Amino acid sequence: MNFLFDLYGTLADIHTDEKKNELWEGLAAALNENDAQALRSEYLAFCDELSKKRAHRFVEFDLLHVFEKMLGFRGISKDKAPELARKFRVLSRERLRLFPCVKEMLAELKQSGAGVYLVSNAQSCFTRDELDELEISGMFNGIVISSEVGVEKPHSEIFDIVLAKFSLCKDDCVYVGNDLHDDVLGANAYGMRTVYIETEQSGSYPELDVIPTYAVKDHGDMKKLLLSLN
């Protein structure tokens, strides 16, 4: 059996605040700018510019290009973009930790012969570092991040990419996530079984008529269920 996991809100408990003054003041200092709020407006304008170029709503642009544009606007080498992106993320982040049982669950699934994959709507310039920080990068058989492949869940194309990249069959895959729209709706429609866990980061979709194959109340139950399915 192959288990495909969402990251944020499913395996990792995260909270960020991209509006707080400390973020924009810190970024302004890094760029030798005086007006932190003007810098925020510039960032949002560049994001909006890239967003408007998308062919459809589930196309995922790479946020690193925004940081490259901000640097280029100031005559600074684009090579500094990953460093600026890391600073942005660290300053915006208020919490990042694994949910209970996650490391043990991933390790036991792999030990039992299951395939363990990460399929996340995320920005690679943030997420690759955070996977290392959480010490779980090496626990997956494969990783697909939406900004790297240009499309996000629930669009079927991201599941096409995952199955082709890792030579998987959807009948042998179970998708695990905390979002009824991005995770359950997409994987259900694709023909995979789904496991849903509600966490603080779960979206609210009162009008969405979607039912997961399984629902668990906590990560201890998730671990038991997935091991029983393998």
Task: Say what each PLM segment does.
Residues 1-3, 13-14, 29-37, 79-81, ...:
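Asp-based, Mg2+/Mn2+-dependent phosphohydrolase catalytic module
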Residues 1-100:
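N-terminal helical cap/lid subdomain that shapes the substrate entry/recognition surface
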